[in-house]
């Protein structure tokens, strides 16, 4: 049926009783006979319990007043969340509670972010050993991530103002060479007695060149992100099984001509005792059309064999920075 070839996604964000919520829904077909089976969705409802923001060690109420680049910005917060998923990937039905603790630090050339999430939920989904098996289990545990980003070289000695020469970008690119570091850990316990835990760590470079103003090869973005893993145990559920091998993640984006950019993302298996050692996986190929007012992305996922279409609109408050084009 022709209607099976038409699909769409929607994201709804807003507030309910002054609390933040979002719904992300996919409709894989608009065929009315298959409508129920084609729907997948997840939602989050977040209530802030505590938040403190400091600029140069002074408490502030409005984070819009960050001040000059020399300012030191710090923020602490605690959120309570309710979440749920339906027919999403390897999940049939999922619901739970989470407590989110966060810390953010920003100073010129250096950022640090830390998150700790405590989670309790009930999940029904495919088994990790037998995909035909549907398991229904309670799960509790935590995940934590520490990320650091340090700018080694700044290619923007003289910061540029946004003007009518930026035809292919809605903002000024932050150019330079960074070192990104990440340490993460997590552990889950399941109601059938199984458990899993993992520690991940890695340090890698990020390079951004060009202004995306000129027509030919005026933007390059390249990131290498190694992840070295140590894992113990495994999940009985397929959807949340922690990655069990070390890998190197490549991400590359290059302007070809005018608004046309190409992108490539993939992971290289670094686990020498793994049967897929030395092979690329999760390969994605992207084509971008980037303009000041909008962008169009087409991404082909080789493993899943699908094409993702994304359309963004920018700068609703645009004030005649450039003539029509």
Where would I find each of the regions flagged by the language model?
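Long, low-hydrophobicity, solvent-exposed regions enriched in small/turn-prone and acidic residues
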Residues: 1-325
């Amino acid at each position: 049926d022709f209607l099976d070839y038409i699909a769409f996604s929607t994201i709804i964000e807003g507030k309910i009783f002054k609390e933040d919520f979002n719904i992300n829904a996919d409709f894989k077909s608009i065929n009315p006979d298959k409508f129920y089976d084609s729907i997948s969705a997840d939602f989050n409802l977040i209530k802030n319990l505590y938040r403190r923001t400091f600029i140069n060690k002074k408490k502030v109420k409005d984070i819009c007043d960050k001040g000059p680049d020399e300012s030191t910005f710090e923020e602490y917060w605690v959120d309570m969340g309710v979440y749920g998923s339906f027919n999403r990937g390897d999940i049939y039905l999922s619901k739970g509670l989470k407590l989110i603790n966060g810390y953010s630090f920003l100073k010129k050339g250096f950022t640090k972010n830390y998150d700790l999430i405590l989670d309790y939920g009930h999940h029904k989904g495919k088994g990790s050993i037998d995909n035909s098996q549907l398991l229904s289990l309670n799960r509790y545990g935590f995940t934590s991530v520490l990320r650091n980003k340090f700018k080694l070289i700044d290619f923007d000695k003289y910061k540029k103002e946004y003007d009518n020469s930026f035809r292919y970008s809605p903002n000024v690119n932050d150019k330079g060479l960074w070192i990104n570091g990440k340490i993460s850990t997590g552990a889950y316990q399941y109601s059938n007695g199984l458990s899993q835990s993992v520690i991940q760590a890695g340090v890698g470079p990020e390079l951004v060149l060009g202004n995306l103003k000129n027509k030919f090869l005026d933007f390059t973005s390249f990131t290498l992100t190694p992840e070295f893993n140590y894992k113990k145990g495994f999940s009985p559920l397929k959807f949340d099984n922690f990655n069990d091998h070390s890998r190197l993640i490549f991400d590359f984006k290059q302007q070809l001509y005018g608004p046309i950019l190409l992108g490539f993302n993939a992971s290289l298996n670094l686990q020498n005792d793994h049967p897929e050692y030395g092979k690329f996986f999760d390969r994605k190929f992207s084509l971008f059309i980037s303009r000041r007012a909008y962008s169009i992305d087409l991404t082909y996922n080789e493993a899943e064999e699908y094409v993702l279409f994304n359309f963004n609109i920018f700068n609703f408050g645009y004030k005649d920075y450039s003539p029509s084009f």
